[in-house]
Design a protein with these regions (language model features):
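Negatively charged
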Residues: 1-148
């Protein structure tokens, strides 16, 4: 599914509820440059075999929120620029992300200027470190923020 919708700049909404992603290993750049995409429901995605999520949502500049709490990322090796340049993204749930096998997280949140600490849910220390590489305001929930 690499680059499947890449460059679909007029695309505003997608219904992917019937997509069978059970055997997919690469979501790299899947929605790259879908600059008009405002919402995306990926709750039916089976991601247990995925190894590459690099650039998956890169330059989705109209996307405001994403709930990826259902994503199984235990086999993912690359998340570089996954949300890069998602300049309107204000809310993100990646609470179940597991980055133990990930070797590339650089620029995961580069130019995500609208992303606020109170609207991101994360539980992984490596992702927290990447968040802090562009903003020092992110903390874990035990430090009294909504990031877990």
């Amino acid at each position: 599914m690499r680059c499947m919708f890449s460059g679909c700049s007029s695309l505003k909404y997608l219904n992917l509820s019937n997509f069978n992603t059970r055997n997919v290993e690469c979501f790299g750049n899947m929605f790259h440059r879908c600059s008009s995409l405002t919402s995306l429901n990926l709750s039916s995605f089976d991601t247990h075999k995925v190894k590459n999520m690099g650039g998956m949502f890169k330059r989705c500049s109209s996307l405001k929120s994403l709930d990826l709490s259902n994503f199984d990322t235990k086999n993912v090796e690359s998340m570089c620029e996954m949300f890069g340049e998602c300049s309107s993204l204000t809310s993100l749930n990646i609470s179940n992300f597991d980055t133990r096998k990930v070797d590339r997280v650089e620029d995961m949140f580069i130019k995500c200027h609208s992303l606020k600490t109170e609207n991101i849910i994360v539980s992984d220390d490596r992702i927290l470190a990447e968040l802090n590489s562009f903003s020092r305001h992110f903390k874990k929930i035990e430090d009294e923020c909504n990031i877990i």
